[in-house]
Regions:
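Glycine/proline-enriched, intrinsically flexible loops and inter-domain linkers
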Residues: 1-435
Length: 435
């Protein structure tokens, strides 16, 4: 299923040229920095999905090799940065082409029957590995819960609960008791919760069996997922879901790790920063007169583990974002980065220290709309086995030299000269610190 509206997925079939047999599909999913909606960057403080941007149902972009130009023009007409969007969509199409070519090259070498058979065997192989890994987890019922700071519209302490049950080679993850979906955009669709569960299960199983669990249908075949309909882990339309993908997914991961920690206390690390620290800025670039839409996530502290300190200034868990170099940022946008570095001392103390967060200060060189979508501003990431919690994050507006503390989720009209300071959480410590 989908994640949130800025994530656009292209899927194409691959047919064997000689037999016209459907071999499989190639797919590309990419986050687009603007897909319309009420604010630049398409990460608004929305209270329904209609405010978040363009909703694209499953439609044909290409038919018999020809592009649907009406659809193409419609998509580009609804976004603030059409040239950038066209380039990103073309890149996704190129990825599909490359995947199709590589798969057909494999078929040409080994034959369609062998390739299709290998696909089925890979799924079965993953199923066997998963079952073997689950069998190494002690049978029992393990419960955990955690909270989101707020939804940006006044609802606080939004709970996520899970009950993990292990029986032989099967496990179930029951989210009964989780808070109902809320007005603000921290609701997650079922696909997000399933993705977080898949990620955590792989993280747990792989070290237990000392094997890499292949991604695919077999990697969740022995896992039962129970999601209460209409909750923040299985939200229903017209719920706002912008932050479900980037923030709630992190908390789901934290809760799942908390449940597994009860079963495997010497394996699971302390909590990492638990947020992607999303920042978007949009407006008109005075250098060109063109619209711009900037979106970035900021790394933070990794939780410490039983054998090592946590890393500082990195993304963890449900994020694969990389650091954006200052030079590239200042070249592309009307910004000046006035400070960027490690937030020393923000990691939790312990036998192994949690990683430190980051501080990133961006000065606006023109007026623009600013949106922050963050978490772990109320409570820092928890330590484990006696380790201390990491420091909570902070969002600060520096205007004419005066600092103003901003909430975890906020939209504001930025003025030329404003500095937006994002200070990300540190990771939790692991084990009691020695005197």
């Amino acid at each position: 299923g989908g994640t949130h509206l800025p994530d656009i997925t292209l899927v194409g079939p691959v047919y064997d040229g000689s037999s016209s047999q459907l071999i499989g599909y190639v797919a590309s999913r990419a986050h687009h920095s603007d897909v319309g909606g009420t604010s630049p960057g398409s990460m608004p403080l929305a209270n329904e999905i209609y405010q978040e941007g363009l909703r694209i149902p499953p439609v044909r972009l290409y038919t018999a090799g020809g592009r649907n130009d009406d659809l193409w023009r419609t998509v580009l007409a609804t976004v603030r940065t059409p040239v950038e969007r066209a380039g990103d969509l073309d890149a996704q199409l190129a990825a599909l082409h490359t995947g199709r070519v590589r798969l057909l090259e494999l078929v040409a070498r080994r034959g369609v029957d062998e390739v299709v058979g290998a696909m089925a065997e890979l799924i079965a192989y993953a199923d066997r590995l998963l079952a073997a890994g689950i069998q190494r987890i002690p049978d029992g019922r393990y419960e955990a819960q955690d909270t989101l700071d707020d939804d940006g519209f006044g609802t606080t302490d939004i709970e996520i609960k899970v009950a993990l049950e292990v029986h032989g080679s099967r496990l179930s993850l029951d989210f009964t008791g989780t808070s109902p979906q809320v007005r603000g955009g921290v609701n997650a669709v079922a696909a997000i919760t399933a993705s977080a569960a898949r990620y955590v299960v792989r993280c747990i199983v792989e070290p237990l069996i000392n094997e890499i669990l292949p991604a695919g249908g077999g990697s969740m075949s022995s896992v039962d997922l129970l999601l209460p309909e209409g909750s923040i882990v299985d939200a229903r339309p017209p719920a706002s879901v912008t932050g479900g993908n980037v923030e709630t997914s992190q908390r789901i991961t934290d809760v799942l790790l908390g449940a597994f920690r009860q079963a495997l206390p010497d394996l699971i690390p302390a909590l990492s920063q638990g947020t992607m620290n999303n920042i978007t800025v949009g407006g008109t670039d005075p250098r060109t007169g063109d619209n711009f839409a900037y979106y970035e996530t900021v790394g933070g502290g990794m939780g410490a583990g039983p054998t090592a300190d946590g890393l500082s200034g990195v993304h963890t868990h449900m994020s694969n974002s990389l650091n954006t170099p200052i030079e590239a940022l200042e070249h592309a946008y009307p910004f000046r980065v006035t400070r960027y570095g490690i937030r020393r001392g923000s990691g939790g103390d312990g036998a192994h220290r949690g990683g430190d967060g980051l501080r990133r200060d961006i000065e606006l060189l023109s007026d623009g709309t600013v949106t922050l979508l963050t978490e772990r501003r109320t409570r820092g990431p928890a330590g484990a086995n006696g380790g201390e919690d990491g420091a909570p994050g902070r969002n600060i507006l520096i205007r004419q030299g005066e600092e103003e503390e901003l909430p975890a989720k906020v939209a504001l009209d930025g003025i030329k000269g404003d500095v937006i300071s994002v200070r990300s959480p540190g990771g939790g410590g692991w084990g009691e610190a020695t005197p």
